[in-house]
Amino acid sequence: MKTVIRNFSHTFRRFFTASILNILGLSIAFASFFVIMTQVDYDYNFNKGYKDYEKIFRIEINPNPDSGWQLWTPRPLCEQLQSASPYIKSISQVESYQPEDEYEVNGNLFKATTCTGFGNFLETFQPEMINGSADALNQPKTVLLSESTAKKFFGTTDVIGQTIFRGKQADNNAWTIGGVYKDYPENSQIRNWVMMPKEADTDKGNWKNWNYICYMRLESPSAAPEIEKLILQIFVKNFPEL
């Protein structure tokens, strides 16, 4: 071992510049490999943080060749689809835009991203609940917080029944916390947001407002081709001009 070290030291002193360049080259190679593999892991595991993720699908529509594929859908499309097939275990509709809102909690102001949808729109993703129940979203003026958001607002996850205000308290827009769910991985479409239900009648029967993203959980991934046909049938029936 001493001989190896002595030879290395001798070579390093004799070929100083070349040795430095070799070390720098190896360092850059290892750093590049680490960065690339980190990105590969991020992409490979994208959206795999959900329970039985392979059963979850997002609806995308291509109305005509000129418009291309899009993920925005009207509310009635998803509701008709849910009742059209026994292979669909649940459907979740969320607003296509998640704003960063200000929240007042015990006199302190925080910023957090808000996701709104209809009913228990987390049912499709089956979050691991730390406290409370995801079904709390079926109650008006009741929200779910992620684990990290609960700790940010209150310093703890034991927050069931606590009140937060969307905006400032003076705005009188109070919401009760009905549950805390475990954080999703960063490489997920549904993130660690304040989950908030919309009013039940919003856009009900309205085919003109394409403002929602629709996710569904199937009994089996093999049912996807049949569901695609159902989507097309419902779409053609309600938009024969396209």
Cite the ranges covered by each PLM segment.
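Membrane-helix entry/capping segments
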Residues: 1-17, 49-51, 230-242
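Generic alpha-helical secondary structure signal
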Residues: 3-7, 52-54, 116-120, 124
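Structural preference for long, well-ordered alpha-helical segments in enzyme cores
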Residues: 8, 27, 39, 77, ...
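Short, strongly hydrophobic transmembrane alpha-helices
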Residues: 11-44, 54
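Generic structural signal for small/hydrophobic residues in well-ordered secondary structure
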Residues: 12, 22, 40-43, 59, ...
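Membrane-proximal extracellular/periplasmic loop immediately following the first transmembrane helix
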Residues: 36-101, 202-203, 209-217, 228-229
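Short acidic/polar micro-motifs at solvent-exposed secondary-structure junctions
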Residues: 61-70, 79, 92-120, 126, ...
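Mid-to-C-terminal secondary-structure elements
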Residues: 115-131, 143-242
